[in-house]
Amino acid sequence: MKIRCVYLAAGNSRRFGKNKLFHMVGQKPMYLHLLDRLAAVAERHKELEIVVVSQYEELLQEAVGEGPGPVCDPSVEKERRALLAGSGRLYPVYSPQSREGVSHSIRAGILAGMPESSPISGMCRQEAGREPDVYVFFVADQPWLSERTVEAFLEFMKKVSGEDRESHPIGCVSCLGEPGNPVWFSAFYKDELLALSGDRGGKRVMKAHMDQVHFFEVEEERELWDVDTLEDQAGR
């Protein structure tokens, strides 16, 4: 099973007052927290690849371990990202259209690997091998989602998929019955995801197929919190 983890790091941060992805949460920029945990999981699971989608060139360069990066970026984590990038399992996708809504980021993440040009040197790869069997969407403004939860969710959904190969499962991390991110989609739903427009996200597709949805419950509600305002970050 080939699993593509699409890391959505392209939002406009309208309510935050500045680019929240670069806002420091603890000792790191917000976007790096979950990306580094996801990279650690991918290092252990060779079936995973990570596609980072952003409209911000600096973020994409840092994501793959290039450029000076933030001074707080631990060398071991930066090196891990660089090694994954060097092996073709972590790659950046420049998506200026993402400013028009999340559907553009979703589309860019799914189509990554197509031989399209990019204004950033070295940021376009021709994906080797077959297309992904699964797309899992992560959001970069969810800095408290743990590495353990990421790995457990992916293992849970691999088991679900393996038990019934005729089904087309969708998976969602939830807390107290409330769905959150990340969300797992069988490639069966690829065309529906590509058909999204504007600021409509993958939850729209999920809600159309609730009979196929498997929820993975976490105990800590904080893991699923995202940060939309400075008050969110300060209060959490």
Residue ranges: model-predicted function:
Residues A42-Y91:
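Acidic donor-binding segment of Leloir-type glycosyltransferases
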Residues E47-I50, V134, Q212:
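Residues at the starts of beta-strands that form the adenosine-phosphate
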Residues K2-L59:
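N-terminal glycine-rich phosphate-binding loop and ensuing alpha1 helix
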Residues P96-D191:
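Conserved beta-loop-beta/alpha segment of the NTase-like Rossmann-fold superfamily
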Residues M24, W144, V183-W184, F215, ...:
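Short aromatic/basic micro-patch
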Residues Y91-S98, F216-E217:
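Short beta->alpha connector loops at strand-helix junctions that form conserved
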Residues M1, C5, D191-R236:
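Conserved alpha/beta core of the MobA/IspD/sugar-nucleotide pyrophosphorylase nucleotidyltransferase superfamily
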